[in-house]
């Protein structure tokens, strides 16, 4: 046997052994094709089918950061105590918010079944004043209006089948007729409270006419119903290409008062939208004469109910939005009520990139009856004229 034969034989033996070991190796199974989420475009963009169901789901929300300065009465400022000498002084009002939203939709034999939820998480200080020391105690109890986590709020959580909606919503007194413009502080003169549980029915005739009837629980000390009798809201709207005319009427079952609003929206140009809204409400049972014994309400409403929150019987709001270009818009609002409260708000909103908007706003409030004994302070103003500004950064998704 020569060396060549020996080498060939050794190589053959090695190949045989390797083949035997390869035959004993574990065979890795081919990965099964992944089942990707299916897009649902029935209800708009962003929806997808929940796997194994016919329900479409969308998840969204926004992250927001507000920086405010100025007077507390403008809703933009804050006050604090100096940590060294205890003097009260101005400071920034700051608030960071994360809002989570969900939408679902599914077609059924009774119509579209929809849900909507919105939950808000906030961190910051308050648009308010520091807490003064309690002279009845020996301990120093200065509260300098510190920043911190605030209460989580459930702003929406409703179910709707066809035109029937039940759950947590905002009052149809506001949602059906529309809010008071695209300014950030649109309630310098308030136009109605918001949070409530509802049982409501919405009807769309398909020819521009729509209507709503809403049974509402209200919220807060003044607004929450005190019996089995709900608050009632009714509304009627006519919408066309030029704009819309809307009216709403509300019955406050706690104080047995009625309030209503009428609104006109017009679009005179493609890049300009304008609105004017007027409100009127009865308030005999909302005004408390605390100077007379047994001549006031058990719960003092201060002239402002759940629906008629403006001062006096009447109020109006007007404003609009002018789109300067595809990234920039100008928004303004003016409001006034019978108690001589004048609110003015204006801002510039700029879309830095799609989904990220920066808004700079200036707000002014003149509380005409500030010096009167019966002045009802809605914005917590500490003087007749308040002015402030707010800078908002918001990433929506």
Give residue ranges: language-model regions.
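Outer-membrane beta-barrel "beta-signal"
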Residues: 350-352, 364, 383-397
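N-terminal periplasmic/intermembrane-space "pro-region" immediately following the signal or transit peptide
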Residues: 1-64
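Outer membrane beta-barrel
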Residues: 46-69, 79, 83, 87-220, ...
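Hydrophobic, lipid-facing positions within transmembrane beta-strands of outer-membrane proteins
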Residues: 96-100, 152-157, 195-199, 230-234, ...
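Detector for outer-membrane/organellar transmembrane beta-barrel domains
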Residues: 234-345
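Solvent-exposed loop segments that connect transmembrane elements
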Residues: 75-84, 128-146, 220-227, 281-313, ...
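Transmembrane beta-barrel strands of outer-membrane/channel proteins
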Residues: 63-69, 117-121, 166-170, 213-217, ...
